[in-house]
Regions:
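Conserved hydrophobic beta-strand positions in leucine-rich repeat
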Residues: 67-72, 92-96, 113-117, 126, ...
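N-terminal capping/linker segments that flank leucine-rich repeat
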Residues: 3, 12-17, 21-100, 104, ...
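Leucine-rich repeat
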Residues: 102, 123-124, 145, 166
């Protein structure tokens, strides 16, 4: 009995220390920090334009409310890492023209309709699997060698000039004009 009481007291003390030492984070909230948004320029954009209550966390409602991210309009050209972008599940338009990204994985972003990565001269890899609502893609003036648009069945316009493309897969993109 004495050992059980001691174990219970230790457990209670540990729980209290954890509760006092760790700030509460509601389920589903995403911290706007270097772990979730490694790129400082993107993190600043998210803080300024997506974190509506300025608590340095994105609630599910804040993530769902973001339908357009336009770095070009805001004259942001120093983003090198788009990690964290997939938290915005209702994203319809992503305009990152002229930024420093080398890879962009948007696979599974089923609501994305318009993507503009033109002028991202360091962009080597673009993944769009599962972007079934994508209708417009501008990937001109990048450094792409392959572009796989398989499964982007809603595509109507694609611009991919001024790349080093050796392979272009448009299978299933029957609406292209």
């Amino acid at each position: 009995m004495k050992h059980l009481k001691k174990a219970f007291c230790l457990l209670l003390a540990a729980v209290m220390l954890l509760a006092l030492g760790v700030p509460a984070m509601a389920a589903g909230e995403i911290p706007v920090d270097a772990e979730h948004f490694p790129d400082q320029a993107l993190r600043t954009y998210v803080t300024d334009y997506c974190d509506m209550n300025k608590d340095n966390k994105l609630s599910a409602a804040e993530c769902e409310a973001v339908q357009c991210i336009d770095l070009f309009e805001m004259k942001i050209t120093k983003v090198a890492d788009m990690t964290g972008i997939k938290h915005f599940t209702n994203l319809r338009e992503l305009l990152v023209c002229g930024n420093q990204i080398t890879a962009l994985d948007l696979s599974g972003m089923a609501k994305l309709e318009k993507l503009d990565v033109s002028g991202c001269s360091k962009l080597l890899s673009l993944k769009l699997a599962g972007c079934s609502a994508l209708t417009q893609l501008d990937a001109s003036s990048c450094a792409l060698t392959t572009l796989d648009l398989t499964g982007c069945s809603a595509l109507k316009t694609v611009a991919c000039s001024d790349n080093a493309l050796t392979a272009l897969d448009l299978c299933g993109s029957e609406q292209l004009t």
